[in-house]
């Protein structure tokens, strides 16, 4: 009898903790929207080419995100998910406007989750369209 109560408490804690664990890993679907509508749009406009998540492996994306270097080291990658950047483009970009109030760290985790989800060596290699 005494074993049932701790087991029940543990089960409730696990069930309640699952959404927090999923949130800590990022929302790849929201990351996909942001990546495609903000990152891809900018890359196509500035360089004439997009960078699909499937162009890199999970390890390559992790190294890129950890290095926090964008535009061959000229910029911080984090700037492109910052509220300052989103505010600067929200008049012409619906995703930047839609996610204007999302915390920067959360949005960065979403983008990380998307590129990891769509990486070359994932189960779902993803393009940009």
Residue ranges of model-derived segments:
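Detector for the c-type heme attachment site
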Residues: 41-48, 66, 116
């Amino acid at each position: 009898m005494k074993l049932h109560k701790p087991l029940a408490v543990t089960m409730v804690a696990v069930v309640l903790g699952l959404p927090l664990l999923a949130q800590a890993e990022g929302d790849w679907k929201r990351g996909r929207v942001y990546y495609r509508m903000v990152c891809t749009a900018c890359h196509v406009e500035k360089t004439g080419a997009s960078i699909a998540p499937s162009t890199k492996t999970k390890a390559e994306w992790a190294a890129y995100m950890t290095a926090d270097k964008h535009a061959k080291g000229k910029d911080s990658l984090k700037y492109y998910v910052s509220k300052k950047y989103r505010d600067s483009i929200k008049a012409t970009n619906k995703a930047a406007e839609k996610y204007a109030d999302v915390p920067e760290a959360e949005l960065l985790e979403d983008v990380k989750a998307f590129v990891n989800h769509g990486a070359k060596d994932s189960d779902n290699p993803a393009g940009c369209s």
